[in-house]
């Protein structure tokens, strides 16, 4: 029997209400409530002019752009701090804080020459000039283990000496903390600072490493150099991302881990400065008149107002002209398009081609202690031991890979044209090409990957999994916890559609799985759910940080004993012993393949083929289930996003410089005209 879901059916199935939870934060404003904050809180839209007001419903856990990697939290880094290079609205790289740069292949060194620029505080007052040393101090902060930067791998992988420096201080912290790893590895330090690491494979000593050995140096106030570990082709694209931004060194030294926990502890050198942050109230950025490119900053004040029910209240406030932008969810989209008073207020966000979505299985369902973090794993009600048996079965995972019809879940957010967003790979098309101009998706084994959805094959894998798991002592139905973040528009509805569609396939004739949808917290979702192992199956996303396929391995790769990016803990399950046999082999083969691909630095075609083969093995072994590209949100907005910066990697698309606030909400016809005119 063939099961399918019509557009009408899946919309009817997606009626779950989103209820957010709030947590009080520690972030504060600069000097108390300002007039801008009061105006924003009252909800007055610009009606064309120099202010931009929007709601937000998820509390940032930090504003520290040197340590965060979350979408919301990088707003300060994107808009309040300038980068060495930036992009125009067509995706062409141009000057930023650096006016020119050159590459010395013999020494593997990039040299950047900086323009005059100033740091300003939360009142917009000049603090000090931006110097090359600010880039050096910021990178040292990123490489300090105590600050737990989420982006440290983007430095240790490419900057000469960074890996040795970082590892030494990790081992030193372990020694000072008396850490003993699960395999019995111990860390000790002598009076001279030499760290001894004693493990099952032997003993190694590590002498102290001076930061001078790291390949970042301030030659003078306006000259900065980076020395790389190899001729990395994507380095310039990496500079438009958080760990390579500057920070005022004396402030970092003064406040340490309190950097960017408030407007007062955040200095800016970008298009805007952070003027105010009141936890669960307002978030205000103001135009920075000291910025070298201030003439191209057209929005004077950016106000974000906290509203736990932004997805519901935002559209109503748009109708009253109280805010400048709101997301129009799928539950109201049809009615807005049918209403003469609102149909011309609906357009879309600019497509973000560097974000892709995929489903991850949790390979760490049981508690695990890393050296610097603890993963709690699944709650008992979701039967973690039973889940551990299930995910160890390739047949079980392939039943999901072939049983999921991504078209119906994508159609929740893209009622029309959803086929254009489907992916059978993790990496999106047109991401990069080899020296012959061949798209990366046509390199190596990725060229052989096609559509997976096939109900007959899914049931074959299900039947094989039932036989295999019954012999292993598993019980049915397998409980599958599927969480979502209630602050993400339509995620709940996508979960409902996925449950209905997948269960209709895999439970046809046998009670195979029980997908249990759970609402996670609106605030701290990643830390509470994904990074804590509180899921069985989870929709995850990844945005490329730079233009090289290695970036697409970051969610999955784990070095031995490391917690990695805390997506699925693939290697952790193997190291803990409940992932065995062919699944363990597939995991370790992938890790080895990534390490081998990373080591290829002189032949770009061989490098791309190697990464393509690794990604194909990840997918073909159903260690990940590809879903699709980021679907542009339907919006009511007064911004012409086609004026803004654009790049297929990094955070350029989040920058507001160059964008005007219009005196009307953009219609779809105007959106398309703006797109064509860019």
Residue ranges and their predicted role:
Residues 10, 389-392, 396-398, 402, ...:
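Extracytoplasmic/peripheral linker and loop segments enriched in polar/acidic and small residues
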Residues 55-105, 267:
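N-terminal lobe/hinge region of extracytoplasmic solute-binding protein
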Residues 122, 279, 305, 451-456, ...:
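Ligand/substrate-recognition segments at binding pockets and active sites
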Residues 275-286, 303-376, 412-413:
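Extracellular/periplasmic solute-recognition and catalytic clefts
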Residues 636-678:
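Long beta-strand-rich cores associated with HINT superfamily self-processing modules
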Residues 181-213, 221-222, 227-303, 311, ...:
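Gly/Pro-rich hinge or "lid" segments in bacterial periplasmic/extracellular proteins
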